[in-house]
Amino acid sequence: KWDKVNYLQEPGLELVIPKGMLYDNVLLNYSVRADSGDIAFTYQLNDTRIPMHDACDLRIGLRRRPVEDVTKYYVAGVTARGGKYRIGGKYEDGVMKVRIRDLGTYTVAVDTVPPVITPVNQAQWGRTGKIIFKAKDKETGINTYRGTIDGKYALFGKPNSISGNLVCELDPKHVEKGGKHVVEMTVTDGCGNRTTGQFEFV
């Protein structure tokens, strides 16, 4: 009910929806899916996503912990086709706590794989005056990135939101043409997995 505080408590799940968070009265199509290998059950709060007025507290219990480092766990939204995407969350005493903005399908996943950094047209960097990297992370996405040229901070940005490439426009006052230069790029994903690569250009 939209005008009451709603509680949903099941084994391994706790959801509190404060009064006024739902736009209307809704009858949830709730179900739990269990796979013996999963870190947590998959909880379908509703078969189609229902947006809420604001974020609400969701807690999902872990059934097992295959990875000791608790920062590698995250609450994942689950698509109709079974794909997972990162919502976030924090581990505390066997439970993942997160705030959600819609009633959909959720579970807990783990990400221990660092991002992949690929230089784009590296042989042309010195000539074009542009250093370009493609940074990808399959599970939790790119969270932070930092680049240096010859040990000094270099500003990288994402001028094209479609490609998502990291681009640095070289400043001739700071980067001398013709000499050999070393670029170091560090990329971190949503669970703190980090990749650092060193690349040279002339």
Regions found by a protein language model. Give the residues of each.
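Short proline/glycine-enriched turn/loop motifs at strand-loop junctions of beta-rich domains
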Residues: 10, 20-24, 67-70, 102, ...
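Short edge beta-strand/loop segments characteristic of extracellular beta-sandwich folds
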Residues: 18, 59-63, 130-138
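Short, solvent-exposed loop/linker segments at the N-terminal edge
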Residues: 49-52, 123-128
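Long, low-complexity serine/threonine/glycine- and acidic-rich segments characteristic of extracellular
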Residues: 88, 95-98, 138-202
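Proline-centered linker/hinge motifs at extracellular inter-domain junctions
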Residues: 112-116
